[in-house]
Regions:
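Generic structural hydrophobic/aromatic packing signal, biased to beta-strands
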Residues: 78-80, 104-106, 137-139, 170-174, ...
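Short, internal acidic amphipathic alpha-helical interface segments
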Residues: 109-168
Length: 207
């Protein structure tokens, strides 16, 4: 399962075209499609295995392997909803990295296309929780995103920037790298540790 996702990342970003319209590249397109479908299935199985350890959470559908521009996505994601509506912040699993260095991150975030007038204010509450070791912030402003180290100083800076609308949203994330030869259960154990770290940040969005 983990190796299937690793193999797929070597092809992420490549342009896909329906095989029947690809001419001499038809075989290549069939191959890319199979890689995308296999990797999405593997990611979905991973997400289901994680959700089975947290049955109070409802797993949403995994993202498709191809984006609207018909390129192989550089990552997959799946949201987990415990209560409330899909407009509100949830937890999300997200594949990241390259075939030589990859893993799955867990984050407190929301589905952008589902948000309503309250969503951004709810998400901002993650900054009301003191930092813990291992987390980082993903900061969005002016249509771009960048990582920021999670320190108490940066937490206060981001609260100010959100207040003055210099930043649009801040996600709280933890990356869980996949190590060579790692078995699924051990990886899920690491995701569980991450879940425990992030739960207070999710709970803050519920208040």
């Amino acid at each position: 399962m983990l190796n299937t996702m690793r193999d797929y990342l070597a092809y992420s970003g490549l342009q896909y075209q329906k095989p029947e319209k690809a001419g001499q590249d038809a075989e290549k397109m069939l191959y890319l499609r199979s890689k995308g479908q296999e990797a999405r299935k593997a990611f979905t199985e991973l997400a289901k295995a994680f959700q089975a350890r947290h049955p109070e959470w409802i797993l949403q559908r995994s993202s498709q392997w191809m984006n609207q521009a018909q390129r192989l996505r550089p990552h997959f994601w799946a949201y987990l909803q415990r209560e409330g509506r899909v407009t509100e912040p949830m937890l999300a699993l997200r594949l990241y990295g390259s075939s030589s260095d990859f893993g799955v991150s867990l984050e407190v975030s929301f589905i952008e296309r589902k948000k309503d007038e309250r969503t951004l204010d709810q998400q901002a509450k993650v900054l009301e929780v003191p930092v813990v070791e291992g987390i980082y912030y993903l900061v969005y402003s002016d249509g771009e995103s960048h990582k920021m180290e999670a320190t108490e100083e940066n937490r206060q800076i981001l609260r100010e920037k959100l207040f003055h609308q210099e930043v649009r949203k801040v996600l709280v994330k933890v990356d869980v790298p996949v190590t060579d030869g790692q078995i699924l259960d051990k990886f899920l154990d690491e995701l569980d540790k991450t879940f425990d770290k992030l739960l207070p940040y999710y709970q803050a969005t519920r208040n």
